């Protein structure tokens, strides 16, 4: 298999930026989620430019390299969850794009987004309850946190769509 030089160069550049954003999340504590979200958006850029296999390899490389380089390993796990979501929705999008006869593909895509997110989010909130919260949390409060996550997903997903369509759409020609 031959890999084009541009693919390797851009992939390496985006991987370096991903790791820098993960590390900066530890330095600039007030912008941690923003920086981790931005780092995870690079997974989507690689998938859209070079395919799902390259995106999966990029994601795996970013997580492994993040564990070696990033000072806060919890932020690497957060990035891993965000990147997994991007990987999952891009895989669903590619699968749905091949199903032209399927009705309501947009609705199915939105449902799939929430399914992929909740496959990761709900077990983390329930299993790591003591680690995530400073004190004991009631079941009602846990449901509020889960509902808040759904709102957070909506904002994160809208930001991802904006970055892909507008920001990367304008910068794409300069890199490729």
Model regions and ranges:
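Alpha-helical transmembrane segments and their cytosolic interface
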Residues: 4, 140-176
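Hydrophobic alpha-helical transmembrane segments
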Residues: 8-13, 34, 56-60, 76, ...
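Alpha-helical transmembrane segments of multipass membrane proteins
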Residues: 18-22, 66, 85, 113-121, ...
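Membrane-helix interface segments
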Residues: 52-57, 99-107, 138, 142
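Short helix-perturbing small/polar motifs within transmembrane alpha-helices
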Residues: 79-122, 126
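Membrane-interface helix termini and inter-helical loops of multi-pass transporters
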Residues: 127-140
